[in-house]
Amino acid sequence: MRYLTFALTKGRLARKTLALLEQLGITCEEMKDKDSRKLIFVNEELKLKFFLAKGPDVPTYVEYGAADIGVVGKDTIMEEGREVHEVLDLRFGNCRMCVCGPKSAQELLKHRELIRVATKYPRIAKDYFYNQKHQTVEIIKLNGSIELAPLVGLAEVIVDIVETGSTLKENKLEVLEEVCPLSARMIVNPVSMRLENERIKDLISKLRALIQEA
């Protein structure tokens, strides 16, 4: 039996995924050692391997077959646009992708004015404005604090992930439109899905049952 390899998004998503898998009896004791410098963790008994990666890299590892299965946020799947199968909504890491800005920007959106949009997610923003709203905009890619853009006049609105909305309120910004809901998803390499169909489908069905019970 070959190893099934998991690429998990570092941080909270990895911890939640491992807790979920543990409920199915799938554990990896090596990963619990906080002092470990290992990059790949192995469960020899179940023939499973795990490694941690930055969110945007997870779909890349899965598309190229370096990992059979990945767990990553829906926002990353949409933004990276990789050839992977999205097989399961894990229903944690819930948040929203939204268009945000000062209240005054609402009219600009309503009348589909030519505006500037600052975001870490240019692909998602472009798809939303061009394909769903049919509004021509100038998209500005930023990497840092996106909320700053409307405050200094760089852009009229931003497209960003909203969890609690507290940062928006502190800066007198608000959610103007919701692009889509987000959560952690399981993705699978298309070739792995064919080669290991039984094992992967069994895992998906067990996880789905567990999630529905919660």
Predicted features along the sequence, with ranges:
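Domain-level signature for soluble enzymes in the chorismate/prephenate branch of the shikimate pathway
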Residues: 1-214
